[in-house]
Amino acid sequence: MHLIPTPLFRRTLLTAVLAWTSTAPLIVSAADTATFTATLSGAAEVPANTAVGTGSLEAKLDKSTNQLTWSVTFIGLTGPATMAHFHGPAMPGANAGVAVPFPSAVSPVEGKATLTPAQAADLLAGKWYANVHTAANPGGEIRGQLMLK
């Protein structure tokens, strides 16, 4: 039995192919982006402190370019923030050096940076944290580990 494609069949097939190809880039781009969140507190510092300030962070890593973009807000600090940045590589409970500084220590802070392949791998492995420092807590007042969402 040999089937001859009808005009309706061709139109349906064309519509299906166009629909698939128009959504394919969306599927790829979603797979190329990793989203992170963090909740910052004094209890997460190493060693922990009794500061009552809090913060929240959202970040996205474009895995094809290693570009990290972020937005962080914080309130209730003992005084003005003196520094704010990402640290790594370190798992929760450990400390590490500064990996990427924030462009400002005034909340809210938005920024972007292109990471090295090693930095991106550490971030994806859960080995980065955000830290906000004050004069009262120069080693860090609030901290939050970046968690893959």
Regions found by a protein language model. Give the residues of each.
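Metal-centered catalytic cores of metalloenzymes
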Residues: 2-7, 20-21, 25-84, 88-149
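N-terminal export leaders
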Residues: 8-18
